[in-house]
Structure formats: structure tokens, C-alpha cells
Amino acid sequence: MITNTELEYKGNLYPNQIISFNQDVDKFNFTSENGVILQITVLRNSALRFRYATENVFEPDFSYAISEDASRGYGDLEVSEEESYYLITTTKLKVLVDKLTMRIQISDHEGNIINEDEIGFHWEENYEYGGNTVKMSKITQNAESYFGMGDKATHSN
């Protein structure tokens, strides 16, 4: 009997082509061929929540950022499917979800880009501690600054 105990290190993993889409009122779920699920929840006309799962299932729902008591609601909410993307539209925002890469672009109705994925969501399996190391790469817009939390070895922007 031959037993192979070596782990296969896969490096960075990325969502691939979206194969299914469904909508449940204000929640939009996009599932890729390799089991990544993107869930977009419309909280308000100008506030969205993005969740990702990497193995066809979400962890229990929890967020420090969203209060249970926060007011919710939106005016118009529409979704359309184009050849290469899905488009979710509220009265204030447009969210484009690329069908091939699951990358996101958020803009206002005048076409000003507010937030845009560069590489977007990706992850790496953590064999030492279990689970995944989640990564996100965004395009920085003109005059935009980024200030992250936690320890810094250099300037915080």
C-alpha cells in the first residue's frame, strides 16, 4: 500500500465563471464553477453588503459592521443580465458583476466609479491553521486614500 501524506499547495485561488444566479428579494447569489458564492445584499439605496463563500456554503452569518437595529430599505431595485455581466441597480448605485471573473464594479448613475476590483476576491488554503486566508485587491481611484486597521510597519495610507 502506498500512502501519500504530502499536501498539495495550490497558492492563490480565484473564482471562475458564474454558472448560476438567483435572487431572494434583496439578496443576490452568484455561484461559480469552482464553488465560490458571492452574495450581495441591498441594505439601503446606497449601502450594500458583499459576502463570499469558497466551498458552496456560507459560514454562520455575523458582522460587526451591520447593526441589527439599523434602518433598512430602498426605493427601486432592478437586476438585468447582459452577455458578459449582471447589473444590479438601486436609485443611487449600479453594481456590475463580471460573469467570467466575479469581479465587481460599483458606480453612481453618472458613471463615476466608486469602487472597483483589480484582482478582486481570492483566497489561499491555510494548511497550518486550517481554513482560508482571504484576500481582496481593489483599484485605487484618483484622490482616494486607504487606511487599514491593525499594526503597520510603515505609513498607514
What positions do the PLM features span?
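N-terminal accessory segment at the very beginning of proteins
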Residues: 1-157
